[in-house]
Amino acid sequence: MTVSFENKDFNQFINSSKFLVEYDVTSALEQEGLKQSDYAEICRRLNRAPNRNELGMFGVMWSEHCCYRNSRPLLKNFPTTGSRILVGPGENAGVVDIGFGQRLVFKIESHNHPSAVEPFQGAATGVGGILRDIFTMGARPIALLNALRFGPLDDEKNISLLEGVVAGISHYGNCVGVPTIGGEVGFDSSYSGNPLVNAMALGLMETEEIVCSGASGIGFPVLYVGNTTGRDGMGGASFASSELSKTSIDDRPAVQVGDPFLEKGLIEACLEAFKTGYVIAAQDMGAAGLTCSCSEMASKGEVGIELNLDLVPAREKGMTAYEFLLSESQERMLFVVKPGSEEELRELFIRWGLYVEVVGKVLKEKVVRVIHKGEVVANLPASALADDTPIEEHLLINSTPEYLQEHWKWTEDLLPKTLDDGIINIKNNLFISWNNVLLELLSIPSIASKNWIYKQYDFQVQSNTVVSPGEADAAVIRIRSQNDFSTKPKKDRGIASVVDCNDRWVYLDPQRGSMSAVAEAARNLSAVGAEPIAITNNLNFSSPDKAVGFWQLSMSCEGITKACLALNTPVTGGNVSLYNDTKLPNNTVIPIHPTPVIGMVGLIEDINKICKKSWVKAEDQIWMIGLPLENNINQDERISLSASSFLEYIHGLKTGRPPEIDLNLEKQVHAFLREVIKQGIVNSAHDLGDGGLTVAIADCCISSGYGANIILPPSQSRLDRLLFAEGGARVLVSCSTDQSVELKKYYKNISLQGSILFSISHLGNVNNQKKLLVSQSNNTIIDVNILDLKDTYKDAIHKKITK
């Protein structure tokens, strides 16, 4: 129960003889990001006032970053079970069974605020942290992905943030030897003061023994392994749980400093140590450092841990207990090991160039007891720190916020009438041809090629990358056995992975936008032939203390839940990042677009049958699977110019309600797509995303070098709607004439078996003329040279940065 105080009452409380302390409580609470009600609850639980070290421990462990005090009730509604799920939310990472004795471990996490302050180190340590979550479970890291958001690139500050973040990601990933195989990047003014850096990692394990974090074995030794502990990253968890301001932007000590070469040794040493059977439990030291690792290991194991800070390897002299406990120095682990194994493990870790010390033991009493300079400096119930943490009570508004009610009034009828060759641009009241509309959309950084970014990443290290960044709708890596003694898996299996979120859609309808993010991720996996298995999510939102902010978060969680249930993709865990707001000097607060990033993984049984997005040969037929281009498109709310890239970037309007998400239709389209890929009926596949039909066709042309002849059916629909409307459940495929016969035959056969919600539509043919030609009723609508499309698309971000 939340207790509220008048200032007078709180002063009386803290000055009472029972709770009197030597430090200034008010300033200490402000420093730790705690409320007066939190302090009263701490005193109630302890039946005494906390000392300054203990208050710091509560500050980080009761922060949103560590305990999800604002979001936990919403997360409980996610579907978390399934036939392949071995480990769900609550551990360092999720684990799914992919057959043949192999398990896939994966998770996504944010490093947003540190990257705003120090983009290189913030992004680099974000990569290091997510890798530790993976190998702490006993899995070898095999791939990295990322989802990034920045402000517009006409601002030098945003360019600097982009360059720093990309450099940090590439530095850490390249040095540690894990390929960065995919991701997504978006740009919007809402991220100008608060960029988003979400890192996802995948790992492979071939043992039945999953290393968990719950400590056990009374009296068993606690082992510290890895890097030394310094003063970097002090209070990082609390820092990540508050809005960014001019003061916090200057708070560089809250950003950690990473060493990827040491992490590489830590990976190998930990995996070797796990094979000995000596390790009972393992926990990496991420947010809240030693405090969090000790608290979580003790709480999950329903035991206690005694930690002697005098034995912790220190990087700097004169460190206080407070600094040891809250430091977030990187590349550190805490183990509980079997008695008698200490020396053997010590030799192992030293051989890999790591610090290793026995720093404590497991206790029967369920407390975290900390010793420094021979004295007990903290003694707290483990559950109070890591399990029985506060939950904020928010009143969920029961009506759509006013800003959305206004946006949802917008209709396509408010746009100028379309002409055969173009449209009047609302933004400046000038005519723009369809050719130039397409070129303009391809030059937008959110749509344009991200080759400037991914060419800085080593995506071929480990030699398992099957699909390189930008080649297909999802990244694909080969599953290569890590152990000679494992059950012999098929050599040609693969894992597909993707990260997705259309933040503009989520801003304009949090529930529909979030459903769409899940559906698009599943559609992208299906477009390479992968069966979606499960998701991890990163919920990036603004302050939940504002009614609209909490409503957005709640509606988003509802949308994710609905989509995951419909598409059979359980949630294995993830991360919540709140208070992504920028406070300007005039006290104006700018919230980011709500951005629930969906990381999804899928299984491919034969990587020789995957599809990329490029046309394969001239004269192939181009088909669209899903919603048809027919007269009734005007009445179909599943396809719309509302909330579209066309509306925002051509007309300067970010408005309207995003299209309806038909999850049953999505499921049918995905299953059909996977099957025709498996049967070898189609040569390429690409979903229709930002920019709609014409941008998707242009993308296929650019990546292949071939052109396309597209003939739009006669329609009463607006031309811009046919060309650039957006919506789900639509995929382009190409196939030969003979394959087209098989495509129609297979569609007819399944149509006879039951109710089919989608159609297949012949749109045209691949050509060798190096041109994209779009016509309707013998009128040429678009006629663009592929080289012009390619130059615009490939160089857009580079030109913005070097202008």
Swiss-Prot record:
InterPro entries (alphabetical): PRibForGlyAmidine_synth_PurL (IPR010074), PurL_linker (IPR041609), PurM-like_C_dom (IPR010918), PurM-like_C_sf (IPR036676), PurM-like_N (IPR016188), PurM-like_N_sf (IPR036921)
- Sites where the protein binds Mg(2+) 1: E109, N575
Gene Ontology MF terms: ATP binding; magnesium ion binding; phosphoribosylformylglycinamidine synthase activity
User: Highest taxon of the source?
Assistant: Bacteria
Q: What are the record's GO terms for cellular component?
A: cytoplasm
Could you tell me the EC number(s) of this protein?
Answer: 6.3.5.3
One of its GO biological process terms is: 'de novo' IMP biosynthetic process
Query: What role does it play?
Result: Part of the phosphoribosylformylglycinamidine synthase complex involved in the purines biosynthetic pathway. Catalyzes the ATP-dependent conversion of formylglycinamide ribonucleotide (FGAR) and glutamine to yield formylglycinamidine ribonucleotide (FGAM) and glutamate. The FGAM synthase complex is composed of three subunits. PurQ produces an ammonia molecule by converting glutamine to glutamate. PurL transfers the ammonia molecule to FGAR to form FGAM in an ATP-dependent manner.
Name under which the protein is recorded? Phosphoribosylformylglycinamidine synthase subunit PurL
Task: List the source organism.
Answer: Prochlorococcus marinus (strain NATL2A)
